Amino acid sequence: MDKKIKLIPGICDTKNRHYLPEKLLDGKTTVNENGNNSQVYPGNLKEYRAVLADDIEDVWYEYVPDSYDPGKKTPLVVSMHGGLMTGWGQAVYTSWTLVADREGFIVVFPNAASKRMWMMECDWEKVIETLGQISGDVPLLHKPENHVEDYHDVKKTVKLIEKMKEKYNIDAGRIYMQGMSMGNAMTGQFARYMGSILAGAAGSGCPTNSKLLFDNRHEVINQSGPLDIWQSRLELDKVPPHYREGDHETIRYNLEYWNRVNGCDALPQIGIRDEYNFAFYKGSQGNNVLMDVKNRDHGQTFDDAELVWDYLFSGCYKDESGRLHHSEPRKKWCVDEVNFAVAKDCRKAWVNNGIMELHKPCFFWEKIKYHGLNGNAIVRGSYAYIPVSSLAEIFHMRLKTEENGRVAYLCGAPQIGKIISEEVEEIQFAEGNIACIVNNSVESMYAEAVMKENELCVSLEWFARRFLKLSVSECDGVVYATDHPSRISWHMADLIRTYLT
């Protein structure tokens, strides 16, 4: 039986405005911000110092849970802190120590060697050009020299992993890395160049500049081969200004990079749980997961480590030859078995994690108020409209039309996946009418039925909520519906739109 996890109560310092307040070291204090949330300083977290490489003394923190069994092979997680933070800071800002308590694995949290900033490959000229856009309290990145394999932070991390293998009974096929912000960029760098010693890598915030992922022919730059990847994104986050590329663009390139390395050619399986948006890619060589969290700022969610472990790390390992294998993870991927989505001006729809053609592109129609406004108008709502004929196909209903399509009937019970509305026998729509006739009774929709390019169209949101009782949300012109509470996020909307365009 798994050891039970227990949270230790703490006193939240609501007045804190620092990245990493030293007060957290007292073992009593917590801080909560919309990018990072902490736990009380873990009792088993121990600091170590030693020369690992280049005659430089490095600092790291080890967490060995009481549940660790030295008699059996044990996974190792290496967790990399964000810029301006420390190894102990990463330990309190994640749930890795709590997950380790239950699972019995070991976690190591290294410090960056200098300025609390990792040595990273970067476009140095762009960094210098962008100095004026960077806050004065943020130190300049290290200027990269020589090859990535020669960076001290990379070399010392390799040596630290070797040291952990010597000190503890580590399973060499189950070594994983995760990082936050600059630690995510460091994890990505390590995964691309030294990832052969990892089975999986994950990170939150700060995706990698695409110029470091692809060469001038758009071929991937990779020395490590496949490994399972988890990419956590935050809806309100922004990529660093020296990237000189958009947020959506950077995230798409990061997805494309690992999809190509891991042989992920099929559509993702999408699942949205409240504010957590997931896209699961299964590849011939490895898996790739995107998580985008709605209404979240730069950093990492406190349960990010739990999610990474449950859905990814717990189900991947490498054999002695270095080949990646998969077993059942602790939790089954949270894929929506029932879902559909449409996007403004797109002629395709996402239906149950597949794609189908609409008869006409989706468009948005506004509901307005103008009485008593002296000729002005107020928009009271904007809704995604698709052809009634497409509703018939998506929801497996029979379509009848009259008067050159200006009147339409949907007959039979609407159904999507296992959800069926037995109450419905017939729905009649007519151009210009907000009313529809449901089983010979009058009902109002959100807005009137509209003829568009000889197709009668109505609100998809209204139809999904009224007849299938689905949860419907909209973001940036993309509407998503499923059978449980969900809120589509900005980056998930962009991802779906790319497949519907």
Describe each PLM feature range.
Residues A199-Q285:
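The feature captures the conserved acid-bearing segment of alpha/beta-hydrolase catalytic domains
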Residues K165-G225:
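Primarily recognizes the serine-hydrolase "nucleophile elbow" in alpha/beta-hydrolase
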Residues V78-M80, S204, V293:
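Alpha/beta-hydrolase
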Residues V51-Y61, K72-G173:
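Serine-hydrolase catalytic machinery in alpha/beta-hydrolase-like enzymes
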Residues W230-S232, H248-E249, N259-E337:
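C-terminal catalytic histidine-bearing segment of alpha/beta-hydrolase fold enzymes
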